Design a protein with these regions (language model features):
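GST-like domain detector, emphasizing the conserved glutathione-binding G-site
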Residues: 13, 18-161, 165
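Terminal-tail/helix-coil boundary detector
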Residues: 237-250
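GST-like fold's C-terminal all-alpha helical module
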Residues: 129-233
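Cationic, low-complexity basic patches in intrinsically disordered or flexible, solvent-exposed regions
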Residues: 10
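Conserved beta-strand edge residues that scaffold enzyme active sites
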Residues: 55-56, 200, 245
């Protein structure tokens, strides 16, 4: 585990001038969805300590040390004073509620006003990212990986055939439907909730990265690719990437 204390650049459109009493800690697993937490913190200019954890080289799972932070042993997890918070969506909402109230400029829409179309879009994408889309992306990764694992040579052809059939009949059609839906939505929305970047874009960012890294042809999804380009071009995203490392396992 590596520990790094970061003091992000003061954000001209974030929370410059807001007093931060306690150092927030991000428990960051390499190549995981916790990257979006770093991105939000960099956008807001919130100081934080970054604790980086490496995946098990064989299982690719989180190391057991994370269970000392939270019983589930997963990432992302943050500690902020006496608070320990897990799950990406819950963490993002907490950070915006606590540190994003004074966000200005293009971050002013992080939390759309209740009752607005932008609010309803934000709520939908906050749930859809992990509740639906990431399920298919994780299944895709699992069924691509299984045939590459050690097994008796006579079992490998069966495993390869079975995994290919599951992908063709179940995973790939559902992923195609999901990505087509995202592409159509981004045809009429610059960001997922509307004209301004919102918390929904941070939540959706990892799923978009994963989809484009795991086989979605950017030429078939130009609007999805353009969303990713806008996201990656942001200086705060680049700072988060430099500190957290590559985003997804390919």
């Amino acid at each position: 585990m590596e520990v790094l204390t970061d003091f992000p650049q003061p954000a001209s459109n974030g929370i410059s001038g807001q007093i931060i009493h306690a150092m927030l800690t991000v428990h960051h697993l390499e190549r995981s969805g916790s990257q979006r937490i770093l991105w939000l913190l960099e956008e807001l200019g919130v100081p934080y300590t970054l604790k980086r954890y490496k995946r098990d080289p064989l299982t690719k799972l989180a190391p057991p040390e994370l269970k000392a932070v939270h019983p589930l042993g997963k990432s992302p997890v943050i500690t902020d004073g006496d608070e320990t918070i897990a799950e990406s969506g819950a963490i993002l909402e907490y950070l915006v509620e606590r540190y994003g109230a004074k966000a200005q400029g293009d971050l002013a829409g992080l939390r759309p006003a209740p009752g607005t179309p932008e609010y309803r879009q934000t709520r939908f994408w906050m749930h859809y990212a992990e509740g639906s889309l990431m399920n298919w992306l994780v299944m895709k990764l699992v069924f691509v990986t299984i045939p590459t694992q050690p097994m008796p040579f006579f079992v490998r052809p069966i495993a390869r055939q079975l995994c290919a059939k599951v992908q063709a009949k179940l995973i790939d059609p559902n992923l195609a439907t999901a990505l087509a839906y995202l592409e159509a939505h981004l045809d009429t929305h610059a960001w997922f909730a509307g004209k301004q970047i919102s918390i929904a874009d941070f939540q959706m960012s990892f799923a978009v990265e994963a989809a484009l890294a795991r086989g979605a042809d950017a030429r078939q999804f130009p609007r999805l690719d353009a969303f990713r380009a806008r996201m990656v071009a942001r200086p705060a995203y680049q700072r988060a990437l430099a500190k957290g490392g590559p985003v997804v396992m390919s």
